[in-house]
Structure formats: structure tokens, C-alpha cells
Amino acid sequence: MINTQQLRQEQTEKAQQIILTDQFMAPTYIAGADVGFENSGAVTRAAIVVMHYPSFEIVEYQIARIATLLPYIPGLLSFRECPALLKAWQGIKQKPQLVFVDGQGIAHPRRLGVASHFGLLADIPTIGVAKSRLCGDDKKLDDDVGSTEKLMDKDEQLGWIYRSKKRCKPLYISPGYKVSMESALAWVKRCINGYRLPEPTRWADGIASNRRLFEQLNKNKL
């Protein structure tokens, strides 16, 4: 039986170890990380894509598949996803200086989303780039590209709400680990290239979702 109370306590304790200052050099390699599922959720599939910055040329990628260890439990997603992410990370030869993770950083009820959890375990600077809001007050943005609001939980800033593309839902950006609030937004902006998602997580999302087009395009780019 899964002890959810113990897992939540572990999140609270690990959140105290999260560093929210910039501890990385100007990156020449940036990675995107995302997780998908196969066999009706029985298999967890993680993809990590390393890209040269600023060309966004793909350097390498790793896909890891493991038996799913936990069912979906709101707020405990990182315990479900991190084991597969760590397995994929172990196979990466060209380690990046910065990783964009599809999911939350500190914008989490206990301030430990998958980007923060993975960054702490792998000891790598991370940014959470989420497609939906998990916590904090939602705010309506103008439809203009670049419209930005702070993602707040009472008096605490958790991240940013950012319009990356017209007529698309905004992104919810938050620092994960060893990245400041300001840098989290700035680096996502630098990696937007005409799509809703920044290039690193756009590619990781496509590969982790098992889309054949992304697999083929990726082979062509290598």
C-alpha cells in the first residue's frame, strides 16, 4: 500500500533543499525532459533531448522505459516520473548546463514539482515549463505574445504565466533547481522559436509522446 502521507512529508523535506539562485554558466547545451506512458499506464517512458544553444541542433537523445512504480496521484507526480527521467539521464553522454522539464518546478503545493525534484536528484539546474496550472492564482493575460503575469500564491511568487504564442493557452514557468525566478522566465523566452513550447521541451514532448514524426525528424537532425 502506498503511504501518501509519507511521500508528502518527503516532498516537504526535499523542498527545503531547493536552491533558487543561478548556479550555472551561460549554457552551450540545453536539454528538454518529458515523460509519457505506454500500455495503459503500465510503462513509464522518459525522453531527454540535448540541444546545442543557440542553434537548437539536436546533439543526442535518450529514451528510457521502466515499469510504472506509482499510480497517478495528484501532487505526487514526481515520484511517478523521476525514476524514468533518472534512467534516461544516466544514458546522456553530453550533459547540458540547463534542463527544461515539462512540468512544475516550485509551482507546486509543497514546492517540489517534477522539475525541482529531478533537478535535486540529478544535481542539475532545471526550469519547470508546464502547460497547465497546478497551484497559485490564475490571471487573465492579453493575447499578445510576450504577455506576462506573476504566478502568485498569496504573497509568494511561484513563477510566471507567459503567453508564448497567440491564440494558445499560456505556459506556467517556474524555477526548478539552481535557477532564479528571473532566469527561469528569461531562458524560456530565449528558447521560444515560433511554437507554444520552448524548443527543448517541444522536442522532448514529441518524443516522450511517441509521435513518429518527431522520431523521424530527430533522426534526420542527428
From Swiss-Prot:
The record marks 72 as: Interaction with target DNA. The keyword Iron-sulfur does not apply. The gene is nfi. The keyword Cell wall biogenesis/degradation does not apply. Its main location: cytoplasm. Mg(2+) binds at residues 34, 102. It is found in: Cytoplasm. GO terms for cellular component: cytoplasm. Keywords: Cytoplasm, DNA damage, DNA repair, Endonuclease, Hydrolase, Magnesium, Metal-binding, Nuclease. This is Endonuclease V. GO terms for molecular function: deoxyribonuclease V activity; magnesium ion binding; RNA endonuclease activity, producing 5'-phosphomonoesters; single-stranded RNA binding. Its cofactor is Mg(2+). GO terms for biological process: DNA repair. It catalyses: Endonucleolytic cleavage at apurinic or apyrimidinic sites to products with a 5'-phosphate. DNA repair enzyme involved in the repair of deaminated bases. Selectively cleaves double-stranded DNA at the second phosphodiester bond 3' to a deoxyinosine leaving behind the intact lesion on the nicked DNA. Belongs to the endonuclease V family. Its EC number is 3.1.21.7.
